[in-house]
Amino acid sequence: MKIRRALAADLATIVRLTEAAYAPYTALLGAPPIPVTEDYAPRIGRGEVRLLESSGEPAGLIVLERHPNHTMIFSVAVGPAFQGNGFGIALLKWADERTRRWGLPEVRLYTNAKMERNIALYKAYGFHETGRRPNPYRSGWTVRRHG
């Protein structure tokens, strides 16, 4: 397993992995999840996107934003064929490590309240709920993990 910075040439792979990973949630939410509709080219240019490769094949990705007092995970996506192998946890650990290297105290993320499988993963990893965003169409949880 290798986690590397995404390049402009990886854009189609990032879109494909994101669409595949979030596909089960489109029907549940009644619309594509926000990461599916994102334009990743600017994020790649800013160095926010990392690809996880398994045996040279793209298996997952994480999008991590650096803020003055925390890091924000915009998206964690693992391709369906690679789920259940610990790659999501590996990406969360990478985010923790990067947060420590930047000298920031915590990692934050938003997740849709209907994404129960993701919420269970985040809680098992040590995130805890800090609030909820009121949105009649996309209610969500705010969670964080202290480094």
Where are these regions (language model features)?
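Acetyl-CoA-dependent GNAT
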Residues: 5-83, 89-94, 98, 102, ...
